[in-house]
């Protein structure tokens, strides 16, 4: 396979990429980094910003997970049909990143004391995505346009994580609830999500996810 993910044993910031590649029928390798590997320092020095994940497309190496998603989107025609759609996809993905950062801050820095307040704020944060869905084909398809985009994979991955954290979090959002089920039931993606490669990989590196 031409693609390689360089990352710790976690879904983390790579699961949206894995979902995209699986759904698109792409093959990839995993270079799993242990904490001992990371502590040695060589991988950290090689990384542009001193952090993982890293990604290889043949002999081309890239860092920053959203840049990796965009590379895959360009490679697999998942970036809209025109510049306006591409800009809307970027806008949605930036919103996903905003919520992911809030989620990760709670998971890694304030899980015990911050989880309840985080879950209470979810209706506001998830409401943005419900309205975005409603504005495109009455919420019956994808978040932008008539075809799946990299932002769909990123959003569905983050929603999967939230359904583990707070299983009822989508109960007030019928469009998002149907959307997650619809995207997750695409045949190749469903096969991946049912596999041990997905199910046995922890969501977060510190084991805190519910």
Curated annotation (Swiss-Prot):
Organism superkingdom: Eukaryota
Positions contributing to glutathione binding: 7, 13, 38, 44, 51-52, 64-65
Annotated compartments: Cytoplasm; Mitochondrion; Nucleus
GO BP: glutathione metabolic process
Keywords per UniProt: Cytoplasm, Mitochondrion, Nucleus, Transferase
SS bond partners: none
GST C-terminal domain location: 82-203
SUPFAM superfamilies assigned to the protein according to its UniProt record, in alphabetical order: GST C-terminal domain-like, Thioredoxin-like
Similarity remark: Belongs to the GST superfamily. Pi family.
Protein name per Swiss-Prot or TrEMBL: Glutathione S-transferase P 1
Taxonomic lineage from the root: Eukaryota, Metazoa, Chordata, Craniata, Vertebrata
């Amino acid at each position: 396979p031409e693609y390689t993910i360089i990352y710790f044993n976690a879904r983390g910031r790579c699961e949206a990429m894995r979902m995209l590649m699986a759904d698109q029928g792409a093959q990839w390798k995993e270079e799993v980094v242990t904490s001992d590997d990371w502590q040695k320092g060589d991988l950290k020095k090689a990384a542009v910003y001193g952090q993982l994940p890293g990604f290889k497309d043949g002999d081309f190496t890239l860092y920053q997970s959203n840049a990796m998603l965009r590379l895959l989107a360009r490679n697999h025609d998942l970036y809209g049909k025109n510049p306006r759609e591409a800009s809307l996809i970027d806008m949605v993905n930036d919103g996903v990143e905003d919520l992911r950062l809030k989620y990760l801050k709670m998971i890694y820095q304030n899980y015990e004391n911050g989880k309840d307040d985080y879950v209470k704020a979810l209706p506001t944060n998830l409401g943005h995505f419900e309205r975005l869905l409603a504005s495109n084909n009455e919420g019956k398809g994808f978040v932008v346009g008539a075809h799946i985009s990299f932002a769909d994979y990123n959003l569905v991955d983050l929603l999967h994580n939230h359904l583990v954290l707070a299983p009822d979090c989508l109960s007030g959002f019928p469009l998002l609830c149907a959307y997650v089920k619809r995207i997750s039931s695409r045949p190749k993606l469903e096969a991946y999500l049912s596999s041990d490669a997905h199910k046995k990989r922890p969501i977060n590196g510190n084991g805190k996810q519910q």
